[in-house]
Amino acid sequence: LGVHIADVSHYVRQGSALDKEALERGNSVYLIDQVVPMLPKKLSNGICSLNPGVDRLALSVNMEVDREGNIIDHEIFNSVIHSKARLVYTEVSDLLEGKNASLYKREPEIAKDLMLMGELAGILFRKREKRGSIEFDFHEPNIILDKKGKVSAVEVSERRVANKLIEEFMLLANETVAEHFYWLEEPFIYRVHEKPDLDKIKEVK
């Protein structure tokens, strides 16, 4: 399994004007009808976007995973990737849920890979459950605006199998990188959750 993240640091050098502005902003802000980006759109939507059919600089984590979801071997490296297709969550979910085979007819090789990825995501999820992971399946509201910018409807965003697949693979990549640096005994920033309060766990149960 390969997880590839755009190598933004190649273009945004430490101490540069772009770096200072990004530090000042802290993060991108997602509003109802627009995004206030942390970085210029020419970067985030251009050379740092993993668009299909073009070479892009990336940071990659390749993981060899067995049938039980255990990582046998891994490699972390700088890479140049050439994406084959731009996929959308709805179409991938339809394929994996057996609702629509249009993606399979159009891109059979990609569809076969997605089926394997879906199987692996299921294995990883079940393994995570056995470790005591709690699944919070919150439905986020999707606010629809009319032409005048006023709220016309509120829909519930459905979290489907494609969303969960990405979550599992990103979790695995993050855990792999964290463990890699842990064993190297190098200074590293870890983003972790504190252990839950036992009384609160009992309330949830």
Protein language model features and the residues they cover:
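Conserved, carboxylate-rich catalytic/transport cores that coordinate ions
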Residues: 1-205
